[in-house]
Every structure is written in C-alpha cells, then in structure tokens.
C-alpha cells in the first residue's frame, strides 16, 4: 500500500481509559504505519505535554516532516490536542482513535468506538473540515455547558453514576439525586440579549453529548454556527428524552421547556459564578465569551455508507 503521509505522530496518555495502553498502542500501529512512512509514538506524561509537543512541531524542533497527527484517548485527551493545534495554528489533519469513556466527536466522524477498528478505518478515511468553539482562550470541538451538566461531570469524576450516560436514572430521580442548582444568567448571542433563571445552559457544536445524539435535526459542526439551549425548570420533566434519540421528540418542535438560540458569538455571565464544562473538562468559571471559528480544523472522517 502506498503511504499517504510522510511522518505521523501518535499521541497517548498512560491513563487513556484503555485497560492495557501498551497493548492498545500495538493494536493501532499496524494500520497507522501502513499509511505513514514514519510513525512516531509519543507518550504524554503530564497535562499540557501535548500542547508543548504541538509547539515543537510548529517550530520544526520535533521533526521537520510531520504531516499528520493521531490521538488515542478520551474526550479530555482529544481536547488537549485540539488546543495544541489551534493555539499553534498547525494546519495538519488529525485522526482520532477512541480510548476513553465517551468519544462524542468520533460518532460525528463515523469512527468505530473500538480503537483497533478505528485505526483500520484511518486507512481509507478522508479529511473533513470542521468548526471549532473558542471559549475565552481555550478551544473545544463539541460543547460548552454549565449547571446540571457540570454536576453530572463531577459525579463521573467522583466515580458516581453518570446521570446522562445512564438514562434510566434521569427523570423521576433527577431532582432528588442532583437537586439542580438554579442560577441567574445574562446571555448575549449575536448582540441579542436574554436573561432569567435556569438550571442548565448548553452551547453545542457537535450533535453528540454524553454518548447520545441531541434530538435536533439540523445541528452540524460544519455550518459556522453554535446552538445554545436554555433549560427552564419545567423542562426537567422531559429529561428522559434529552440525551436520547426518540422518534417522538425533536428539539426543533419544542417551545416549552427548552429555548434554542443559534448564533456565532456568545457572552455569558451568571450569578453566582458557575463552573463550566468544556468537552468533559471543568477548567473555567463564568463569565465566559464563546465564538465559533468556522472551518478551523481538519479531522479524518469515515464516509457514511
């Protein structure tokens, strides 16, 4: 087989979510080495290492001929690579190999959830161009959320039940289990202002969150827009449906309970200050400024057959 690329770099964390990371590396390199003349395998020991390596690739200090990047890991690891690529303006395609709890954006790219199968898909995958979310000085592929979604992420980190991932726990138990905190918000989207009280605000770029599809038919990470959702108190009665695709429900048709506002530039302040979940990583608090950067990143995409 003809090598598509000259020099690929495969990034991974030791704690990637795979039970045996060394075995996992061996399983994916067979396919990746068939499309790269030279494949470097790069361990990221500490948070921030991948961003540092991206800087070295940009300045040619890592190697002079790197022309593709691969990442084996979960959403947090992928998020670090996205930040490294965007911060250093690396115009290189990225192949994502699932290796964590959720790989929401790999579903968008039609990539298999198994890392070995995903690596084999890279052989015939095509490069697609996707929008990126900028949040203050950070970047993300998939979503920005606060309120209930942050409480859920903290539950997962504590080893508790993943509320959005375990849909049977949503609905009747959501108020007793999570006791959603109400907060006041002031939101500006493309110069229009909104204010009120809510338990959750979500701005989405990709159509999957927490492993399930957002039931909104026209949500696309290639349309130059973000979709912001404001959930009011009454909307928790339909939380059973929110992160679960159901024929009987479509967010396009919902007016009561969930307010949907598409837009490109967003400013958000809250009272009190709220933690912010960015692709599963909680690293910021409000106030935040959000914008979509169209056609910002190249990702290997499997053709949807």
UniProtKB/Swiss-Prot annotation:
Disulfide bridge positions per record: none
Named cofactor requirement(s): Mg(2+)
GO MF terms held by the record: ATP binding; ATP-dependent diacylglycerol kinase activity; metal ion binding
UniProt-annotated catalytic positions: 281
NCBIfam families membership: YegS/Rv2252/BmrU family lipid kinase (TIGR00147)
Functional note: May catalyze the ATP-dependent phosphorylation of lipids other than diacylglycerol (DAG).
EC number: 2.7.1.-
GO biological process, any: phospholipid biosynthetic process
PANTHER family: LIPID KINASE YEGS (PTHR12358:SF106), SPHINGOSINE KINASE (PTHR12358)
InterPro entries, A to Z: ATP-NAD_kinase_N, Diacylglycerol/lipid_kinase, Diacylglycerol_kinase_cat_dom, Lipid_Phosphate_FormReg, NAD/diacylglycerol_kinase_sf, YegS/DAGK_C
Limits of the DAGKc domain: 3-139
Annotated family: Belongs to the diacylglycerol/lipid kinase family.
Residues the record lists as binding ATP: 44, 74-80, 101
Source superkingdom: Bacteria
Membrane spanning residue stretches: none
Protein name in the entry: Putative lipid kinase SAB0675c
Residues engaged in binding Mg(2+): 220, 223, 225
GO CC aspect terms: plasma membrane
Keywords, ordered alphabetically: ATP-binding, Kinase, Lipid biosynthesis, Lipid metabolism, Magnesium, Metal-binding, Nucleotide-binding, Phospholipid biosynthesis, Phospholipid metabolism, Transferase
Cofactor binding, note field: Binds 1 Mg(2+) ion per subunit. This ion appears to have a structural role and is required for catalytic activity.
